[in-house]
Amino acid sequence: MILDKIVEATKIRVAQEKQVESPEAVKAAALALPSDTGFPFEAALRQQDFNFICEVKKASPSKGIIAEHFPYLDIAKEYEVAGAAAISVLTEPDFFKGDKKYLQEIASTVKIPVLRKDFIIDEYQIYQAKVWGASAILLICACLDVPTLIKFRKLADSLGLSSLVEAHDEAEVQMAIDCGARIIGVNN
């Protein structure tokens, strides 16, 4: 299954990233930043009856490279001008060709909230999201058990990050509810 391959690759990537920048350093950097307890990502989704989270994505496992020339900043600016409530930015490099620089540069350019879209399996990635300028993170039920979902959601809350909890079926929607998710995304 592709999700299993992505999670395994993510474990390797996170271990390598921890060798470059220690978990203690990333945590300290995240904790040194102000926490916006107003949760701007959630507030943005409440602005109107219909709100859009628009995605900046270079590739996917099913489609391959979507855009060889990838003007991610221009795309993000166009989304903002078009009225997007928030922008989802892929940071997973192996299967989606994402990059932390996409998130960092978009977050520092647009005025709307930005979600780190990745396969979050380690607290380290949540601290990274905060440091990189995200307003929210994606937590995928299929990758995590309920205790871990709760732990990660609470950590994100403490940093002022919203959690969009993704479910693929009815059982995962129940998992999202059980973990106290305030935002649930259904992907099937």
Language model features by range: what are they?
Residues 2-67:
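An N-cap/entry alpha-helix motif that binds or orients negatively charged groups
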Residues 36-48, 96-119, 141, 148-166:
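Alpha-helix-loop-beta-strand connector modules within alpha/beta enzyme cores
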Residues 53-71, 112-121, 162-167:
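Active-site mouth loops of central-metabolism enzymes
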Residues 58-60, 93-95, 120-121, 125, ...:
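Active-site-proximal loop/turn and secondary-structure-junction residues that shape catalytic pockets
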Residues 67-90, 109, 123-136, 150-152, ...:
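Alpha/beta enzyme core
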